[in-house]
């Protein structure tokens, strides 16, 4: 179910404030955030945002195609290591 149009998209207030300040000053520093549920706005295009995955911050460079999506969509929280091949069951006699 999508978010109500009446409410509008969610973005963390502190994150939006930092983005607007950097746009005014012309800075391009990496911004750390824990807000994975924030929607990507057009003002964020061209910035690098380090999104927390539960362990560390993963840098995400925001492009035009990402507008409207959430920050957490671009950072995986689980790492799949693969299934271990069992030597005994794979050999047939």
Swiss-Prot record:
Q: Which UniProt keywords apply?
A: Ribonucleoprotein, Ribosomal protein, RNA-binding, rRNA-binding
Q: Which residues form a coiled coil?
A: none
Q: InterPro entries recorded for this chain?
A: Ribosomal_uS19 (IPR002222), Ribosomal_uS19_bac-type (IPR005732), Ribosomal_uS19_CS (IPR020934), Ribosomal_uS19_SF (IPR023575)
Q: Does the keyword Ribonucleoprotein apply?
A: yes
Gene Ontology, cellular component aspect: cytoplasm; small ribosomal subunit
Keyword Ubl conjugation annotated = no
- Give the matching Pfam families: Ribosomal_S19
User: Could you tell me the Gene Ontology terms of the biological process aspect for this record?
Assistant: ribosomal small subunit assembly; translation
User: Which GO-annotated molecular functions does the record name?
Assistant: rRNA binding; structural constituent of ribosome
Q: Which family does it belong to?
A: Belongs to the universal ribosomal protein uS19 family.
Q: Which PANTHER family match?
A: RIBOSOMAL PROTEIN S19P FAMILY MEMBER (PTHR11880), SMALL RIBOSOMAL SUBUNIT PROTEIN US19M (PTHR11880:SF8)
Annotated function? Protein S19 forms a complex with S13 that binds strongly to the 16S ribosomal RNA.
Protein name per Swiss-Prot or TrEMBL? Small ribosomal subunit protein uS19
Per the UniProt record, the lineage of the source organism begins with: Bacteria, Bacillati, Bacillota, Clostridia, Eubacteriales
Originating gene: rpsS
């Amino acid at each position: 179910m999508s978010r109500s149009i009446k409410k509008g998209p969610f973005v963390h207030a502190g994150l939006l404030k930092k983005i607007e300040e950097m746009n005014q000053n012309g800075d391009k520093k990496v911004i750390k955030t824990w807000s994975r549920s924030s929607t990507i706005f057009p003002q964020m295009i061209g910035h690098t945002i380090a999104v927390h995955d539960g362990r560390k911050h993963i840098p995400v460079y925001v492009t035009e195609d990402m507008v409207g999506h959430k920050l957490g969509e671009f950072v995986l929280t689980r790492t799949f290591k693969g299934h271990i091949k069992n030597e005994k069951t794979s050999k047939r006699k």
